[in-house]
Amino acid sequence: MSFIKDLYKSTNGNQTVFSLVELSNINPDYVGPKLNSAIKYLVKNGDLIRLSKGFYALNRTYSIQEFANKYRSPSYVSLYTVLFESGIVFQPYTSIYLLSKRSETKIINGVNLIYKNIKNDILLNSLGIISGNNISKATPERAICDTIYLLGGQYFDNTRNIDWELIKQINQDVYTNNKIIARWIQENTKLI
């Protein structure tokens, strides 16, 4: 089937999750009922995996973070997911934490996706957010600010590799000098 060939060509190995809109853009010959019929056929034959309504993967090794970003857009991976991955907190978290326009928890293929609501002007400010490999993810500095802003004062196990100038800039430009974040920065830079 030419649809699946076009799909493999378009990914270049980077994209692992596709929305219905992306699938229709890959091959413009497939629209409406023809697209739905092709997707149904590919899912039935095991060439595509249906992750959730309107979202598909080529195989089971898809990126759960990529899916989580696409499932609720705009969103970015942050909080304990980034803090654990970057070694700032040592307790492992199996859930994926993201910030988006609304709070909700979804379980998709056995993985908890926890979306936390944050104001639009903060959500849409790109300072401290890295986009690559089809994933938008906070830097450790942005994740610290996000966590303190949403959850209050926190203890972090390892802040040795934090860029303190970046964290101050994020507090100033994204959080408009939030007092709780500023106090945390002041208390923790004294320890250095």
Residue ranges and their predicted role:
Residues 1-74:
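Short beta-edge/loop segments at beta->alpha junctions of small alpha/beta modules
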